[in-house]
């Protein structure tokens, strides 16, 4: 894992949370309903056992609903969803949002891509295939010059999805 990005994700900590790595406070989160991620790459000590502590306060807070005794039960508290470590390369695709637009038998595929970590001579390649079929069709490849990129491709011979003949497509985005 040395030389890689280590991203610690806590999917649910109700309600106030403080995160400690090897005794050092590395962050906090004030919402029991949303996941949060912290980059621990610089805090991890390689070759020894590292310690993660999550301190959670589940008492009612005026800043996190429900409050004001508007519900007739005690809300849950503590870590109620997964905690996991995601290991990434130094530069990686952080977000890929794909949306499609169908017009007749051709479609338009628009992807908003966010990369993290930077670097030189990087490119993003995108390809598509129908689910259940082998082999992708290359849509294109584009140089990544910053952290954000929008790709816009036309895809021919698209079959629409419907309840009688469901057709699913798989899009692969590579850095």
Regions found by a protein language model. Name each.
Residues 19-23, 126-132, 175:
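Conserved aromatic beta-strand anchor motif in extracellular beta-sandwich/beta-rich domains
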Residues 34-38, 147-153:
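Short strand-edge motifs at loop-to-beta-strand transitions and within beta-strands
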Residues 4, 44-49, 155-170:
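Short glycine/proline/serine/threonine-rich loop/turn segments at secondary-structure transition edges
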Residues 1-95, 118:
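Accessory beta-strand-rich segments of carbohydrate-active enzymes
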Residues 106-143, 149-151:
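Beta-strand-rich binding/interaction modules
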